[in-house]
Curated annotation (Swiss-Prot):
Enzyme class, spelled out: transferase
Residues the UniProt record annotates as site (Important for determining product chain length): Y218
Pfam short name (any one): polyprenyl_synt
InterPro entries: Isoprenoid_synthase_dom_sf (IPR008949), Polyprenyl_synt (IPR000092), Polyprenyl_synt_CS (IPR033749)
Similarity comment text for this entry: Belongs to the FPP/GGPP synthase family.
Disulfide bond residue pairs: none
Protein function: Catalyzes the trans-addition of the three molecules of IPP onto DMAPP to form geranylgeranyl pyrophosphate.
Lineage: Eukaryota, Fungi, Dikarya, Ascomycota, Pezizomycotina
This protein's name: Geranylgeranyl pyrophosphate synthase
Organism the protein comes from: Neurospora crassa (strain ATCC 24698 / 74-OR23-1A / CBS 708.71 / DSM 1257 / FGSC 987)
Length: 433
């Protein structure tokens, strides 16, 4: 057994040298005999300036070999430290909110709060980068656009209302903003996983940020609306936003209390929730138009058609399954139009009600629920209701048009709804169109 004597000196206490803190292989810590030779016995240090006697098995390393190892490591460490400066250890780029190294600052002076004007326009620091942070979830969802039915509706009704182009641009933008913002909240409240075939915004940005963004966009839309300079605009906005939240509130209440509404309760809810944004756009257009045509009764019927058709497609449509997941309304526990009909067609059978209670993601259970609803005639009933409402909307469209030949846009929208429904039935029946 040979003994190697190493002189270890210590300076005053202070932060560890950079070479001790780095995990980079280029930074070699000073020779640590405990690490290199775990079996070595290091006696307690009694003085920072006294030699440390370490017993090392002679068959492991010689004193000459140890000295050579120390010298090589010291040279490598000095070379590495000389080549690598502190900034190279930091990220190569910084976002506006990454903490970059700052020079020492003088301590803050609390006396400045007695005199400084913190609210002057020159001190405001709201920037484009901050705006992007706030609108992140909204921009994300906008980056995966839907079918843009609402802007198509605006154009179709404008054939009768002839709204000035500047006003129409504002109205179209406001409706789009409100619709997208409402979807952000809907996905949170419904515990959705997919929207338009992509992960929902709150699964990426988090629930708090997504809710805040949605609320922010509501008020941003209100600010945008004031460009119309129409005293009726704000009143229309507040009335229909209240209706939207009333409808959504009842929908959530029925789901969370497992309360099956009546068909009339459902229709009232849809008129508020889905019809609200449809009416908002048309009422704003009428407020900016010189035409005396009242399109609100027609848009109310169209709102019913859209929501009932959406409920139907959620449980029946393959494309819907790809975009939002299989029978998402069943997983949510939602009392949709076919579900309400099925439950009330046989109140003594509690199976469907219990499936809703489970909020299941099991596809076999959901297939069973769909088969049960089919056995109660609920899908056939829903298809008939949609057709009756579409026929009613067509008649109302012709009454409004009164032979002027400006009803084509509305008829195209209604045609698309019926075609979509027929294609879904054909797919289910295994037919080829």
């Amino acid at each position: 057994m040979e003994h190697v004597t190493m002189a270890v000196t210590s300076s005053s206490p202070g932060p560890a040298p950079l070479s001790l803190l780095s995990n980079n292989d280029d930074f070699i810590a000073p020779f640590n005999i405990n690490t290199k030779f775990p079996s070595a016995i290091v006696p307690p240090r009694t003085s920072s300036n006294q030699p440390i006697s370490v017993a090392i098995p002679s068959n492991r390393i010689s004193s000459a070999g140890l000295a050579a190892t120390q010298q090589a490591q010291t040279r490598k460490r000095k070379a590495s430290v000389a080549q690598i400066s502190l900034p190279s250890m930091l990220p190569t780029s910084f976002s506006p909110y990454t903490m970059a190294p700052q020079p020492p600052q003088p301590p803050p002076n609390p006396d400045r709060f007695a005199t400084e004007d913190f609210f002057s326009p020159s001190r405001r620091t709201w920037s484009e980068e901050k705006e992007k942070v706030l609108t992140g979830p909204y921009d994300y969802l906008n980056g995966h656009p839907g079918k843009d039915i609402r802007s198509q509706m605006v154009k179709a009704f404008d054939a009768w209302l002839d709204v000035p182009s500047e006003s129409l641009e504002v109205i179209t933008k406001v409706i789009s903003m409100l619709h997208t913002a409402s979807l952000l909240v809907d996905d949170v409240e419904d515990n959705s996983v997919l929207r338009r075939g992509f992960p929902v915004a709150h699964s990426i940005f988090g629930i708090p940020q997504t809710i805040n963004t949605s609320n922010y966009v509501y008020f941003y839309a209100l600010q945008e609306l004031q460009k119309l300079k129409n005293p009726k605009a704000v009143s229309i906005f507040s009335e229909e936003l209240l209706n939207l939240h009333r409808g959504q509130g009842m929908d959530l209440f029925w789901r969370d209390t497992l309360t099956c509404p009546t068909e009339d309760d459902y229709l009232e809810m849809v008129s508020n929730k889905t019809g609200g944004l449809f009416r908002l756009g048309i009422k704003l257009m009428q407020a900016e138009s010189r035409s005396p045509v009242d399109c609100v009764p027609l848009v109310n019927i169209i709102g019913l058609i859209f929501q009932i058709a959406d409920d139907y497609h959620n449980l029946w449509n393959r494309e819907y399954t790809a975009n939002k997941g299989m029978c998402e309304d069943l997983t949510e526990g939602k009392f949709s139009f076919p579900v309400i009909h099925s439950i009330r067609s046989n109140p003594s059978n509690m199976q469907l009600l219990n499936i809703l209670k489970q909020k299941t993601g099991d596809e076999e259970v959901k297939r069973y629920a769909v088969a049960y609803m089919e056995s109660t005639g609920s899908f056939e009933y829903t298809r008939k209701v949609i057709k009756v409402l579409v026929d009613r909307a067509r008649q109302m469209t012709e009454d409004i048009d009164d032979g002027r030949g400006k009803s084509g846009g509305i008829h195209k929208i209604l045609d698309r709804i019926m075609l979509h429904q027929e294609e879904n039935v054909a797919q289910k029946n295994g037919k080829k169109e």
